[in-house]
Amino acid sequence: MDEELLPIQYALHPAYPNPFNPITSLRYDLPEQAQVTLAIYDLMGRKVTQLVNTTQEAGYRSVQWNATDMHGKPVSAGVYLYQIRAGEFIQTRKMVLLK
């Protein structure tokens, strides 16, 4: 049997690279199908952009952020938070954009 191994638990991994300029990759694990949202926030808690908002199958996922807001405009250098919500799982991590 050639079954793909699935994650055993939800996880949001550190951004790579971090610090970054101008692109970073955000990886996350889904042990089961879930409604997933992955959003970027500034340190004031304002949503900068939303990268994912869909139902996804179980597996290892990755999405890139190119340091732009929801209107496609470049954001300022600084610290940003990225948060995943998948089912009941919620996790937030920090990343740093250098200019």
Predicted regions, residues:
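Glycine-centered coil/turn sites that cap beta-strands in beta-rich domains
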Residues: 1-16, 20-41, 50, 62-65, ...
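Surface-exposed loop/edge segments in extracytoplasmic proteins
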Residues: 46-52
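Helix-terminus/capping and membrane-interface signal
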Residues: 43-46, 96
